[in-house]
């Protein structure tokens, strides 16, 4: 009976109490807490980033200074060459090429040095140095010029077949059509001097097939007609 009385006395309209919702920390608060807990690692990370930025800036400034110094030395060497002082110019070109390796001025100096050697009859020395230069994988425009100089040096040594190959390599390295065509004309000439008529004809036909818009095209037509007797 007591149990029934308790049940009957209960108010069926009363609802169970809902516990209050307790909100957790906000995203910003969690971020602040994480930063405080990891401030040591954050400081290290920021230090690394700052070091990378500073190193990059320093290397950029150093590279620019190196390039400027190299250009100044190169211009002085050119001035000596223009004045007819080839021994002084040669020494300065060598200095720029070795001291400022990798700069535009160093590439120019290496080519100017070997051009001077051709003019002074040092073709074999030029051949040896130019082959090393080309083997160092310089930018295409310098590889092309070096190949042309190498071909000329080999022609001076009466090595027409090797010269033809050097000119072909220069053509392959060239980026502009006119430069490719000029190198192929030189290749045909060198091959012809060595009695390699088939290679000479092939070089000329490449000009006629691929580089019709260049100034070398009519020259190639004439030389091919001479070699093939119009056939």
Where would I find each of the regions flagged by the language model?
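N-terminal positive-inside, membrane-proximal cytosolic segments immediately preceding the first
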Residues: 2-48
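Short solvent-exposed coil/turn linkers within tandem alpha-helical repeat scaffolds
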Residues: 65, 97-106, 134-143, 171-179, ...
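TPR-repeat structural position
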Residues: 86-87, 123, 160, 197
């Amino acid at each position: 009976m007591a149990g029934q009385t308790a049940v009957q006395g209960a108010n069926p309209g009363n609802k169970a109490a809902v516990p209050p919702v307790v909100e957790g920390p906000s995203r910003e608060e969690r971020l602040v807490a994480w930063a405080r807990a990891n401030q040591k690692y954050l400081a290290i990370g920021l230090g690394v980033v700052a070091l990378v930025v500073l190193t990059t800036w320093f290397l950029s400034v150093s590279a620019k200074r190196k390039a400027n110094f190299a250009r100044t030395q190169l211009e002085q060497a050119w001035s000596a060459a223009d004045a007819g002082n080839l021994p002084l110019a040669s020494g300065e070109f060598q200095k720029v090429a070795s001291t400022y390796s990798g700069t535009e001025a160093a590439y120019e100096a290496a080519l100017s040095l070997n051009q001077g050697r051709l003019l002074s009859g040092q073709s074999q020395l030029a051949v040896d140095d130019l082959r090393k230069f080309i083997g160092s994988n310089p930018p295409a425009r310098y590889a092309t010029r070096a190949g042309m100089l190498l071909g000329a040096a080999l022609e001076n040594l009466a090595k027409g077949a090797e010269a033809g190959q050097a000119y072909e390599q220069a053509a392959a390295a060239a980026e502009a059509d006119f430069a490719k065509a000029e190198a192929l004309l030189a290749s045909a000439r060198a091959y012809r001097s060595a009695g390699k008529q088939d290679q000479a004809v092939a070089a000329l036909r490449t000009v006629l097939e691929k580089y019709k818009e260049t100034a070398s095209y009519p020259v190639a037509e004439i030389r091919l007609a001479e070699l093939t007797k119009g056939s």
